[in-house]
């Protein structure tokens, strides 16, 4: 069995700049990885089978993102004559990231499967090819495939490499799961934030346009942010439900975590501009 890191991400800022004709929203956001996340487990098989060894309660196997990613890569490799005879895999995930938390867990899992199976099966797809497969699974998957902090536009698929400060974060989960459509479907969501350049946005104070909706509709999110803001600059990540506070040192973040009320679960992690997955592929590190 091989173990592969599947890191979390934070949206350091998130602005909604318009609604598209297809119902999706245009946005501008800044992705950064954390040195914390899930672990994807892969055991190569030689009988051509793909098996899920860690089912997720409430998620049908055909809807599971790691299985969808594996089937997508297998199909593309077969179409292009790159699939080794008998290539298959047992697939699983050790979950640490909450579902519906805004940390990108499912997208990260899918990207890790694409990148790791491409490596294990030696199918030879380029980063661009894997990213094009990934966007079929979700708008956030390409940033995890590419493994570099990025400024994203469009629906999140147009990526420009970025190098935000690698700060320490206390990431807290308020104990609720927020489906993305709940936030994007709210009539009070800000949808007309002016489009600005990456250079301009990096100089401004960071905000998340989804935050006021999450706080309005989920009192747990409001309470978590109110508590964190007593100690440090804090924001919602993605559409929630997770929130985060930023610190200059690990010790500062851990001191605040020790004071957290019982109802607020969290962890401390460092923001990193290069994904632990890419380091694992390069043989520079093992999974956490």
Swiss-Prot record:
GO molecular function, one term: 4-(cytidine 5'-diphospho)-2-C-methyl-D-erythritol kinase activity
Pfam family of the protein (one): GHMP_kinases_N
InterPro entries to which the protein is assigned, alphabetical: GHMP_kinase_C_dom, GHMP_kinase_C_sf, GHMP_kinase_N_dom, IspE, Ribosomal_Su5_D2-typ_SF, Ribsml_uS5_D2-typ_fold_subgr
Catalytic activities: 4-CDP-2-C-methyl-D-erythritol + ATP = 4-CDP-2-C-methyl-D-erythritol 2-phosphate + ADP + H(+)
GO BP terms, alphabetized: isopentenyl diphosphate biosynthetic process, methylerythritol 4-phosphate pathway; terpenoid biosynthetic process
Enzyme class: transferase
Binding site for ATP: 98-108
The entry's keywords: ATP-binding, Isoprene biosynthesis, Kinase, Nucleotide-binding, Transferase
Pathway(s) served: Isoprenoid biosynthesis; isopentenyl diphosphate biosynthesis via DXP pathway; isopentenyl diphosphate from 1-deoxy-D-xylulose 5-phosphate: step 3/6
E.C. number(s) listed in UniProt: 2.7.1.148
Keyword 4Fe-4S: no
Active site feature: 9, 140
Cytoplasm in keyword set: no
Annotated function: Catalyzes the phosphorylation of the position 2 hydroxy group of 4-diphosphocytidyl-2C-methyl-D-erythritol.
Subunit structure: Homodimer.
Family of the protein in this entry: Belongs to the GHMP kinase family. IspE subfamily.
Protein name as catalogued: 4-diphosphocytidyl-2-C-methyl-D-erythritol kinase
């Amino acid at each position: 069995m091989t173990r592969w890191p599947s890191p979390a991400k934070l949206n350091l800022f998130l602005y909604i700049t318009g609604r598209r004709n297809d119902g999706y929203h245009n946005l501008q956001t800044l992705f950064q990885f954390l040195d914390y996340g899930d672990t994807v487990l892969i055991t190569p098989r030689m009988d051509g089978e793909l098996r899920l060894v860690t089912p997720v309660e409430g998620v049908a196997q055909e809807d599971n993102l790691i299985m969808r990613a594996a089937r997508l890569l297998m199909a593309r490799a077969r179409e292009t004559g790159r699939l080794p005879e008998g290539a298959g895999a047992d697939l699983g995930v050790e979950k640490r990231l909450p579902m519906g938390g805004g940390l990108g867990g499912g997208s990260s899992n899918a990207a890790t499967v694409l990148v790791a199976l491409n490596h294990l099966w030696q199918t030879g797809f380029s980063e661009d090819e894997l990213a094009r497969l990934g966007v079929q699974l979700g708008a956030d998957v390409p940033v995890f495939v590419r493994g570099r902090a990025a400024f994203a536009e469009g629906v999140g698929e147009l990526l420009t490499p970025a190098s935000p400060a690698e700060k320490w974060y206390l990431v807290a989960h308020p104990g609720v799961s927020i489906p993305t459509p709940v936030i994007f479907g709210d009539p009070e969501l800000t949808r007309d934030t002016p489009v600005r350049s990456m250079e301009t946005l990096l100089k401004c104070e960071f905000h998340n346009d989804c935050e006021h909706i999450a706080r309005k509709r989920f009192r747990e999110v409001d309470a978590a942010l109110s508590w964190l803001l007593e100690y440090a600059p804090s924001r919602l990540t993605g559409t929630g439900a997770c929130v985060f506070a930023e610190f200059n040192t690990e010790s500062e973040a851990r001191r605040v975590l020790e004071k957290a009320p019982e109802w607020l679960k969290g962890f401390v992690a460092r923001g990193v501009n290069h994904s632990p997955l890419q380091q694992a592929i390069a043989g520079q590190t093992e999974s956490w």
